[in-house]
UniProtKB/Swiss-Prot annotation:
Gene transcribed to yield this protein: dapA
Biological pathway: Amino-acid biosynthesis; L-lysine biosynthesis via DAP pathway; (S)-tetrahydrodipicolinate from L-aspartate: step 3/4
Swiss-Prot/TrEMBL site (Part of a proton relay during catalysis) positions: T44, Y107
One Pfam assignment: DHDPS
Species of the source: Thioalkalivibrio sulfidiphilus (strain HL-EbGR7)
GO biological process, one term: lysine biosynthetic process via diaminopimelate
Localization in the cell: Cytoplasm
Protein name, entry field: 4-hydroxy-tetrahydrodipicolinate synthase
Known partners and oligomeric status: Homotetramer; dimer of dimers.
Gene3D superfamilies in alphabetical order: Aldolase class I
Amino acid sequence: MFHGSMVALVTPMEADGSVSDASLAELVEFHIQKGTDAIVAVGTTGESATLDFDEHCEVIRKVVDRVAGRIPVIAGTGANSTSEAIELTRCAMQAGADACLLVTPYYNKPTQEGLYLHHKAVAEAVPIPQILYNVPGRTAVDMHNDTVVRLAEISNIVGLKDATGDLDRARDLVARCGGKIDLYSGDDATAMEFLLLGGKGVISVTANVAPAEMHQMCEAAMRGDRAAAEAINARIDLLHRNLFLEANPIPVKWALEQMGLIPPGIRLPLTRLSERFHAPVREALAAAGITLNA
């Protein structure tokens, strides 16, 4: 249903932490011009954890309105409360999003049956295409492949974003449910190999700063052209690593600020990038051929 380079869009903020509507609109245009295949709004990279409910819905609406049907918009609507996830997902559907991305419930550590029933409840309550999101490094819960296979039987669960970076796991998922749902990498460092295994795309942090390159790499990998994919990926490989020197989205927001694309705002408890990481992030941007503001 969705494919290619799907940017995990930052939510640009002014220095006081307010959402910058002007920068948000400019980012949407930047991505469409550079070939990004879909925009994922208000996920982890979009600071969903520090936007309140109304802000969350409003950012989704603004992205959908600005995109105006030119590329798909996938809205992050996960929560660790099933009822809240349902309400956020309903809000996204009403705003006109093409699909929703639902992270596994975090912190309260549900069982596999709890994960199944949570996602089943959201899917049954809101008839919009839904993509599961497994990122155990952040959530403290891991959705096992067996649970994914069960959920793949639900008609409007259409995909999985797997951010584990475990390619053996990805290979097993492709074999067991690749014909029922689409599988997306959520780990830039292993995304190329994930796509060569049969993945349909990547929900990418790197795409915030290198959208054209991520689009080109995805196209090459998905058509099975390893040599072309490797050549493109080599230019952005340092970004895949250095954009995670501190917790995402700290480094990528700083990088976008240096590129002149967003203001400096980020919400507590996240802080601006530590000075010791400025040089490594600049090095990664330079390796990718990205021009910074003077």
